[in-house]
Amino acid sequence: MLGTKQVFSTEWGGRPLSVEVGQLAKQANGSALVRYGDTVVLATVTASKAPKDLDFFPLTVNYEEKLYSVGKIPGGFLRREGRPGENAILTSRLIDRPIRPLFPDGFRHDIQVMIYVMSNDPDCSAEMAGMLGTSIALSISDVPFDGPIAGVTVGRVDGEFVINPTTAQLEKTDLELQVAGTSTAINMVEAGANEVPEDVMLESILFGHEEIKRLIAFQQEIVEAVGKPKFEYTVSKYDEALTAELEAARPEIVEAVQVEEKHARDEAINEVIAKYVAMYEARLADEPSKLGEVSGILNKFVKDEVRRLITVEKVRPDGRRPDVIRPLASEVGLLPRAHGVGLFTRGQTQVMSVATLGVIGDAQIIDGIGLEENKRFMHHYNFPPFSVGEARPVRAPGRREIGHGALGERALLPIIPKEADFPYTIRLVSEVLESNGSSSQASICGSTLALMDAGVPIKAPVAGIAMGLIMEGEHYTVLTDIQGLEDHLGDMDFKVAGTKDGITALQMDIKIAGITREILEEALEQARVGRLHILDHMLETLETPRTQLSKYAPKIVTMTINPDKIRDVIGPGGKMINSIIDQTGVKIDIEQDGTVFIASTDQEGIDLAMSMIGDIVREVVVGEVYDATVRRIEKFGAFVELFKGKDALVHVSEFSLERVANVEDVVKLGDSIQVKVTEIDDKGRVNASRKALILEGLSPEEREAYEAKRKAARESRPPRDSRPPRRDGDRRPPRSTN
């Protein structure tokens, strides 16, 4: 049974926006249908009836791109949507990040957010519509949520900021930023940029926040009209008496958290916890739940002391000051057969990035609900369990790995040379070998070194750094180059990557409601200083890209042919191009504009393939001289091959200055002769002459004598109308147009 639909409308980035509630998915705790232009997104929120016995908040966000939204039927045998693509995974993370901090502390009900893209208009962002729909569904539901939030995309076209740029505007923008937050603060940023200065990045974030405030006011109208009362929930609290008793352990905790080395520090903390758990085992044997609280209380002390030491005493767990970067080390060229390798180490975080160069045909084909595209630059990030000293099952890359890989890709894309300048597909793989925080940023540094080691002519080196934040009341401390414990116990993970001239990528996640302009400004400046320090170190390892590619990398040459000739090169069913590949051992890719890429590690194979393709697409030019081969002899003349696939007729009268009665008196099959093309008729048939070349070789006196002889011969002939009819029919029968 259909419910009563209520519609709320406004505009967003110059396009119509409407929200429908009350009609669809009524059994969910909350649902909203968002129409933005021709984009239609359904967002639903469901909560479990009872809390889960977990030590974390069980929130799941699934963003699903339905292929019917763009009128496509899925491929594959089943013709169903399969596992989510990379864009869907990244969008799920994008929506999760701004809503997660706004659920109550200690809230443990299972929350599932599902977003269906049901119609997709490329000019009206389904991702941002999905974020808006999620916030509305949560805000009008009975689920406790300290929203609403909103998110927008900000671009910069011709120096002007634009809200939710269209696909055409995105082609021109030097900045693409997604920012989300509440009416009072920003709590999520994701950006890719073309070396944008820090002040421009900050202004773009604040520009987006103004639009966020307007969208939140719009949502509040919806909540006032249809919002449900929030359900009651319980949050377990530690026993106050037990907490007071365990205060005796605090001095030992303070000492343990200041052990500088990661594993030694973890061991020291665990020893303190184990000691006090053992002390209380006998006493609390009849109260197992309270015994479980002992480790929880002590872990809370660990968090409290780490944060206090940083904010009050300005001392970090490893002894650094807030703005100090861990020791750096880097190397290149470690793997002899790989095309490029960069090993980057920062403290106890180490990443080996490997660059592989491939042909254009190796590019990844992206075919989702967006426009189909070929992706010639890829960055993949792997995080094996041994990197943190653990033994656990190895599975396919998860959301975190995909997200970190995409962040590195976004950071490096602005420095990758254009296809016309460097016609290679580039794949980077970052293997995390050790991790104690900031591994995604180490992968960016390692990847830059790998690109330079591979000889890729990058625009400029890129480095990345992760900033942190500890906030206690009105006091806060911004941390440079956070390690794992600071990331885990801190309030912000703020990743900034860029060149010496500006930012290429930025990502911010926070665990508090939001941060202010002042904190953003300080974090960006501190990150800039740190980034420049890291870049200086990297350039000491390898100052410029290598001038030569690895001998194991394919050589790629390009040639341009007439697009009308592409079908001739490919041949029926690919017969011709496959024949060239089989004979030469090369890889061949042909673009629609007639650009041909020929790749191989063997230069001779490349040269032969170029010659074969050149013969296929070569055009006959009137007036040019060719070294031809006699292929067929007829009474009226001989057919000669000018080059492979192109023949011409040399008429019997065009062989010599003298009259030729029999063609075979002057040429034989297989003879090589020089001829000059004299005509291409309207049917494409080519006429050539040997006599024309002989005439060109005569001296003026010889030519004059020849012309006089011809004139005399013509005058001695009887008139044409007095001649009898020819007995052999036409002078020249039809011939092949080859």
From Swiss-Prot:
Belongs to the polyribonucleotide nucleotidyltransferase family. The keyword rRNA-binding does not apply. Residues 554-613 form the KH domain. It is found in: Cytoplasm. The gene is pnp. This is Polyribonucleotide nucleotidyltransferase. Keywords: Cytoplasm, Magnesium, Metal-binding, Nucleotidyltransferase, RNA-binding, Transferase. It is an enzyme of class 2 (transferase). One of its GO terms (molecular function) is polyribonucleotide nucleotidyltransferase activity. It comes from Exiguobacterium sp. (strain ATCC BAA-1283 / AT1b).
